Amino acid sequence: MSRPQFDPSAYAAQLEDKKSRLAGLLAPFAAPAPEVFESPREHYRLRAEFRLWRETGNEKRHYAMFEQGDKHTPILIEDFPIASRRINELMPRLKAAWADPALGFKLFQVEFLTTLAGDALITLCYHRPIDDAWRQAAEKLAAELGVNLVGRSRGKRIVVGRDYVEEELSVAGRRFRYRQPEGAFTQPNGEVNQKMLGWAYEALGQRDDDLLELYCGNGNFTLPLATRVRKVLATEISKSSVNAALANLADNAVDNVSLVRLSAEELTQALNEVRPFRRLADIDLKSYAFGSVFVDPPRAGMDPDTCELARRFERILYISCNPETLAQNIAQLHDTHRISRCALFDQFPYTHHMESGVLLERR
């Protein structure tokens, strides 16, 4: 993780630059002006990862980060204003615990995961085996800090408490509860994530047909969108994300979603009847009356075959973490679909990265 340049006084200008950049990328497709969803200026990031750096000639260690492309010049961190208040509160208390050799010896990396609901999990990574002595010290530390702890060393993982955090997000007046596993992808900016969910919920609208969701992750969007349609078929390839999504569906009593562990490419093959999949044995694909598809792909965007799959749907709701590949995908779809809504979500203040969303509807 590289360190963003934190400068709240520059936030408005940087956000305007992102808005102009997104509008420029979508201009060839006659897109409407993007709706803009701002981030808090500080304490917005719910995750943080630090290396540990030892001062030359003594045993004093610091949290450290590095500029992108430079892994040899550490930036020593005492506090981290872009991270959640909970992370900033935990950082010095955890640092004091390194004095215990059971916890501090050959510790090289620390990862914090927190939620808007106040939950916290810390992962400690070691260049040595961890054992029962580590567990005993970790149990004491977890109780003192009020957190869950995970220890990692080569080939070993010890969990103290839970290996996930619990989040609560509000969409259209309803609260949704989420388990967010250690090591799995979660949206880093909780406040902006909540705004994204609300935008997607509104953009989809209330439907009497079915939704296909590709790349569903832990069910972040699945839960609120499932309340807008008759039923959902959702796909995800990561095993830990699938398990979290299934737990989240159960915890929220959402019973109109079928989740399958398939890639977007595999699902395309299944829908095209190119080949059967055992993981679809209990699902009747012909029973679905799909009107919409929701996609939240990785930075590479949708591959050409998945784009062609999306073309079949009346509505394509697309959340993107890379506006360049978003524009490439829209170029492939533009002859059959037009952009009726678009949005900029400032998930990553003080960086060039941006999250965006578009609703494409059949012409």
UniProtKB/Swiss-Prot annotation:
A single Gene Ontology biological process assigned to it is: tRNA methylation
What is this protein's gene name? trmA
Query: What EC number(s) would the UniProt record show?
Result: 2.1.1.-, 2.1.1.35
Entry keyword set:
Methyltransferase, S-adenosyl-L-methionine, Transferase, tRNA processing
Task: Give the protein family.
Answer: Belongs to the class I-like SAM-binding methyltransferase superfamily. RNA M5U methyltransferase family. TrmA subfamily.
What does the UniProt record say this protein does?
Dual-specificity methyltransferase that catalyzes the formation of 5-methyluridine at position 54 (m5U54) in all tRNAs, and that of position 341 (m5U341) in tmRNA (transfer-mRNA).
Instruction: Please write the reaction equations for the catalytic activity of this protein.
Output: uridine(54) in tRNA + S-adenosyl-L-methionine = 5-methyluridine(54) in tRNA + S-adenosyl-L-homocysteine + H(+); uridine(341) in tmRNA + S-adenosyl-L-methionine = 5-methyluridine(341) in tmRNA + S-adenosyl-L-homocysteine + H(+)
The beginning of the lineage is: Bacteria, Pseudomonadati, Pseudomonadota, Gammaproteobacteria, Pseudomonadales
Looking at the record's lineage, which domain of life comes first? Bacteria
Q: Which residues bind S-adenosyl-L-methionine?
A: Q187, Y215, N220, E236, D296
Query: Which GO CC terms are listed, alphabetically?
Result: cytosol
Task: Please give the PROSITE patterns that the UniProt record associates with this protein.
Answer: SAM_MT_RNA_M5U, TRMA_1, TRMA_2
**From the UniProt record, which GO molecular function terms apply?**
rRNA binding; tRNA (uracil(54)-C5)-methyltransferase activity, S-adenosyl methionine-dependent; tRNA binding
InterPro entries, alphabetized: MeTrfase_TrmA_AS (IPR030390), MeTrfase_TrmA_CS (IPR030391), SAM-dependent_MTases_sf (IPR029063), TrmA_MeTrfase (IPR011869), U5_MeTrfase_fam (IPR010280)
Q: What is this protein called?
A: tRNA/tmRNA (uracil-C(5))-methyltransferase
Q: Which residues form the active site?
A: C321, E355
Annotated organism of origin? Pseudomonas aeruginosa (strain LESB58)
